Every structure is written in C-alpha cells, then in structure tokens.
Amino acid sequence: RFESVDFHPRPGFNLVTGANGSGKTSLLEAIHLLAHARSFRGRVRDGLIRQGQPSLDVFAEWRDRTDTPHRAGLRHAGGDWEARLDGAPVSHLGQLCEAMAVVTFEPGSHALIDGGSEQRRRFLDWGLFHVERHLGDDGFLALWRRHARAHKQRNALLRQQADGAQLDAWEHELAQAGEALTRCRERYVVQLAPYVEAGMAELLPSAGGAAIALLPGWRRQELPLADALLLSRDRDRLLGHTSLGPHRAD
C-alpha cells in the first residue's frame, strides 16, 4: 500500500484511524512482519513487495524495560531475507522474534476462542517464548524444541513397530520435556488469568465473568506423563502416533 512510511508511536495506547483502504492494516502488518518474520495474512511474502519495487524494508527502534535502546531491520527481496539486530547480521529470523515481543490480534484471532486447540497452544507458547528466558539452555524455545523432537521420534518408532527398549529411551525424554513444558504453560496461564478476567468484565460485563485454565493433554492429576505414555503404548502403536501429551493441551 505504501512506498514509504514513518510511524512514531507513543508509550501506551496508540489509535490508528483512517478510511477503508487507507493502509491501516498495512502499517500493523509491517510491525507484525518485523517481529514474526511472516505476515498475519498467511503465506503472502512475495505479495508484500510493492509492485515495481525490488524489495521491502522494515526498520524499528525501541527501548526495552531497562531503557536499553535496540534497532532491528528486515529486508525481503524475492525469495531472500536479510535481517540485522543492533547493527549485527541475524543468522536466523528467530532472533528477531526473540528480540521483539509483539502479539497481534486481527480478524482471524477469533480462532483463539472458537477454533481448535492448536491456535491456543500456539498463543501460549509464543508468550512463553518471551517470558521464560530464565530457563537456561536458550530458554523456553530449547525446551519446546526438545519436546517436539522427542514427540517426533516416538511417532516414528510407533509407525515402525519398534521394540520396547527403543521406545523407553524416547518416552523418558518426551516425559521429562513434556512435564517441564506443561509446568511453564501452567505458570503462564495463572499469570494471564487476571488480565482475561478483567478484560472480559470490561468488554462483556453481561457475560458474567470469565476464567481460563489449562488442560494439559493427559490425566495429569492421576498419573505422570511417563506412566501415561507407557499405558498408551499399545494403542498408540495401532494409531501410529502419540495420542496424549502436551501436544494435545488446550
């Protein structure tokens, strides 16, 4: 929509107004793009470049909670991406995602309420990616990847009808990572709950209040994940995938 735009938001609430088609969404999309390395409109990267232009560029300056200044830039030209953070080249776009904590609500965000559980897990984990940096070993992202890898390996072994010894090793890893992942999600839901309740009371007072809680993806109050995986092993062999665990959380 724009050839060039400078936007200088103030701390706190900023309201962007304009007629239909004036570019309000394009402005928000640029901010989202810099923080997520993708558009909230799906896989439309090539369509983001203005017709007749070789590339798009997004640049931002901000200060974090310690008042430390930061600078980030992203360039997309055809199939190539180039990014810089605080003057240094970025080796992978995830570094921009980590540096900029941006949560976007757009027309498709209603899926958080009426969509499948995958949308809600993604929302939780995106928040945790930014707030659980104290975990060590690269923080929450490393834990999430550890769980995803173990989950993928167990599924592969189930499809191969692997023996118990092979499954034991990966179930141990999956259980350890899965329990830790679930504890992170539970803490985050507890932190989010007051904001959800206050927001609902203000926006929809007639609804009678709201509450959020985490369904961990297995009967966690009855048995640890390691035991649940062992008990479900025969059924999961028939299914060819893991039927319970944090990947089924809601």
PLM feature spans:
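Nucleotide-state sensing region of NTPase/ATPase domains
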Residues: 32-119, 124-125, 131-136, 190-201, ...
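Conserved NTPase motor "head" modules and their coupling/switch loops across ABC/AAA+ ATPases, GTPases
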Residues: 1-19, 32-33, 45, 75, ...
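Conserved glycine(s) of the Walker
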Residues: 23
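An accessory alpha-helical subdomain
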Residues: 108-204, 217
